[in-house]
Every structure is written in C-alpha cells, then in structure tokens.
Amino acid sequence: MKALRIPEATVTRLSIYSRFLERLEQRGITTVSSSEIAKGVGVSPAQVRKDLAYFGEFGTRGVGYNVKDLIHYILKILGLTRPWNVILVGAGNLGTALCTYRGFIDRGFNIVGVFDNDLTKIGKRIHDLEVLPLERMPEVIEQHDVKIAIIAVPLGSVQDIADQLVGHSLKALLTFGPVVVDVPGDVVVRNVDLAVKLEILTFNLVFKELHSII
C-alpha cells in the first residue's frame, strides 16, 4: 500500500492552527468551528477541513471542534507531545540570536549544545550554554539523545558541517541562506532564506502594478 503523502503546506498550516487554538484556549473558549479557525488564520474553511482530514475525523457536525482535544491531536501529529533536544552549530550573530529565541523553548525545542570552530568563540557563554569545539558534538549528541541540528555557519561551511552531523547519525537539519545541501535520502533538511521571504513581500507590493501593465 502506498504511503499517504502529506503536503508540506498542510504541515505548516497545522502548526499555525495549533497556535491559534492555543490562544483560544487561553481565552477560555472550548469549542470552535472550521469557519472560525479559517478566519483566524487567513484560509478557507474547506482548507481547514481538508488539512485535518488527512489525519482522521475531528469534531462534530453542527457543533465544531473541542479546542483542547484538537490542540492535543495536532501537537501529536507534529511530534510536539514530547520535548526535542537540539544542537546549534555556529556561534556568530545568527547563532547567538537563535540560541536565545524564546519561541523554540515554548514549542518544546531545547538547545542543549552550541558549537563553533573559532577559537575566539569557544569557551564563551551564550545565555546558559558554553560554546564548545566541534569535536565535542558526538559526546553531546549521545548524552542528550539529539535528533535535530541547526546550522548557522557561513555558506561555504554548511556542506561540511552537514556531512559531520550526518556522520554523527543526525537525521534532521535546519539551514539558513541560499544553499542546497547534499545529504542521504533518509536525512530531512529544511532551509530558511530570509531574502526569499523579503522577495515574496516585494512581489506582493508590486503585483498590482505589474498586473495592470501586463
């Protein structure tokens, strides 16, 4: 039987739904409709129902969804009913900012090690973590059962660091900038390029003008 392929956009929206639902729960709201979720996150009610339908039947027709239960189901789908230990490679400006980003902790991602090969950075502390040399990665990965790594190094070093992390049996990597990393098929890599996000914004700013010309 062929495995069901879940669109990545659906997974992204599930994360957005969960945050919206958590805000409702904080306000004491116990039941919500697909229309209310859709309005709150900027999609159609049909899209909400379709995204949830990939994973089963949720809610009651004419009543809606139990907010607490739906939060639990979505967090379970996203693998967020347990904490995840993460290491960060690169203690420069980006790495420092990521290490102190509260949003990771709030979603259950705990940075347990920060690494760099720059002798001027090794030994310094970022928040409550000491910057360690790359040679210490295997030790920390094993000690904390790390599955995920964030790579925040110069573009020319990303592939080398990715190779080292894969060699240490990590299967999930997050990278930054315009770089394509070559990894084995069983390793998941996701890239964040902030310049691309800005280009999407500029496209939307000029789209109406371009459309009128075309």
Curated annotation (Swiss-Prot):
**One Pfam match, by short name?**
CoA_binding
* Localization of this protein: Cytoplasm
Q: Which GO terms describe its cellular component?
A: cytoplasm
Covalent S-S links between cysteines: none
Sites where the protein binds NAD(+): 90-95
Q: Which InterPro entries match?
A: CoA-bd, NAD(P)-bd_dom_sf, Rex_DNA-bd_C_dom, Tscrpt_rep_Rex, WH-like_DNA-bd_sf, WH_DNA-bd_sf
Q: What processes in GO biological process is this protein linked to? A: negative regulation of DNA-templated transcription; response to redox state
Citing just one GO molecular function, the answer is: DNA-binding transcription factor activity
Q: Which Gene3D superfamilies match?
A: NAD(P)-binding Rossmann-like Domain, Winged helix-like DNA-binding domain superfamily/Winged helix DNA-binding domain
Tell me which UniProt keywords the record has, alphabetically.
Cytoplasm, DNA-binding, NAD, Repressor, Transcription, Transcription regulation
Ranges of the DNA-binding region feature: 16-55
Question: From which residue to which does any coiled coil extend?
Answer: none
Q: Which family does it belong to?
A: Belongs to the transcriptional regulatory Rex family.
Q: What task does this protein carry out?
A: Modulates transcription in response to changes in cellular NADH/NAD(+) redox state.
Subunit architecture: Homodimer.
Quote the protein name from its UniProt record.
Answer: Redox-sensing transcriptional repressor Rex
Which organism was this protein described from? Desulforudis audaxviator (strain MP104C)
Q: What is the lineage of its organism?
A: Bacteria, Bacillati, Bacillota, Clostridia, Thermoanaerobacterales
As recorded in Swiss-Prot or TrEMBL, the protein's gene is named rex
